[in-house]
């Protein structure tokens, strides 16, 4: 008998919206989780083709090695460039997104083999990369701009850098328009969990 594919759910939202927190809650409730942004970061220091492409785009100085010989990448330097030069960001995305998609396809196959019912794909850039076409449902995590900015700064970003990242992403209203579910993360963790639980129960009705 052919393995049944899991329900494929995208989780996205602007910087500081809280999508990682939502995904952690969904994972606790029983969903499988594919972290596209984490995979992309791993590719930047592990995949030879990606490394060569990044060196070509940004120069070899964005890479260094620590005392043990481990390859390191200067993400701050790259971020400062790509959020000021949209064409560089587009080129970086063209380099990385096909490989992230390949990794996602492999994860879908694993979930199908193991009988997992719901696979959530967390990605900061979902619609922009056309990744929504591979998915059955989309969850957008939203919060007001002031709160999102404060959260980004609390994570260590300079205020101006956080603003640039917000401006480089799709407007939140545009994301909300294309979502199957919208989770508003403007309140307490308990209020957030209650919304996530409602969405999870709705997803279960699709797979049962």
Swiss-Prot record:
Pathway: Cofactor biosynthesis; coenzyme A biosynthesis; CoA from (R)-pantothenate: step 5/5
Molecular function via GO: ATP binding; dephospho-CoA kinase activity
Keyword Transferase found: yes
Alphabetized UniProt keyword annotations: ATP-binding, Coenzyme A biosynthesis, Cytoplasm, Kinase, Nucleotide-binding, Transferase
SUPFAM superfamilies: P-loop containing nucleoside triphosphate hydrolases
PROSITE patterns: DPCK
Entry keyword annotation includes Coiled coil: no
InterPro entries per record: Depp_CoAkinase, P-loop_NTPase
Binding site for ATP: 16-21
EC number: 2.7.1.24
Name of the molecule in the record: Dephospho-CoA kinase
Organism for this UniProt entry: Chlorobaculum tepidum (strain ATCC 49652 / DSM 12025 / NBRC 103806 / TLS)
